[in-house]
Amino acid sequence: LKENGINQENAVLLAGGAAGDFSTMSFEERIRVASIVIDEAGSIPVAMGAQTTSTQELIRLSKEANRLGASFIQVSCPFYFNHTEDDFFDHILEASRASEVGMIIYNTFWTSAEVSFGMVERLTKIPQVIGLKWATTRSVAMEFEDVVHSFAGQFCFIDNDLLFPISHMLGARAFEVHLCNHWPEWGIKLLKTLEAGDYKQVELDMVEEAKPFYKLWKKIEMEYTRGDGFLDKLCMELVGLPSSRCRPPTRDIRERYRQEAKKMLIASETPRVEG
């Protein structure tokens, strides 16, 4: 990543998020992964994944992230049970009391309660909450746009919904890009094109270069296995980077989809694809 242009001016690294197998790691493994990433990142800010079903564990993760020198922790609503917004708010509040590390609140509405407009208003009262990783259900009420437009002056919004031209126009300044794991230059180009206001080109680049990745991801989920990061890791292997399979229960896709993924990368003009 660093060798191909990623730096403190254009990126924040996420250590131990969903694509990083956080849900299958022990507490000790999560801390070790974050420690290694922080050491290797140098001046690049690091967010440590702190998603958990346990508030007590979140408190420990917050303290460890602060000790390690992480810039942020990523916090989502506890899953499995259908927790209320008040449950989630108290969960966040406990983390804020545990340490001074910054917090990115991740709206994982597909596994837990969705963060409402009212909840975002309440989050403005917690100083450590500096970012929202944002995706929403979609309706005529334009929930995604409503929150970004209303709160872009108070939070750094990370677009996790692939609505990059729209979100940037409304004030979002960060963008969740899986392609950067194997093609960091693509994310750098995205930022430059957005900042230039060339939204037509951004959308064309997304359709021509990013969509094939996400389309294959969706296909794999529909016909073979589910999870996160499985295609990221295969693509990393295909451009010569050390990687692995996802931990079970997500099944290993590498041999089954290797050739299809390779063709996708070549068709998208991804650099460094090997033999």
Question: Can you describe what each PLM-predicted range is?
Answer:
Residues 1-114, 251:
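Active-site beta->alpha loop and helix N-cap motifs at the rims of alpha/beta catalytic domains
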Residues 3-10, 179, 183-275:
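C-terminal alpha-helical cap/extension of soluble enzyme domains
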Residues 6, 66-73, 98-101, 120-131, ...:
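Structural recognition of alpha->loop->beta junctions
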Residues 28, 32, 86, 90, ...:
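Conserved active-site and cofactor/substrate-binding residues in soluble primary-metabolism enzymes
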Residues 109-218:
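Catalytic alpha/beta core domains of metabolic enzymes, predominantly
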Residues 51, 153-154, 222:
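A generic secondary-structure micro-motif detector
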Residues 36, 94, 122, 189, ...:
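Alpha-helical scaffold segments in soluble metabolic enzymes
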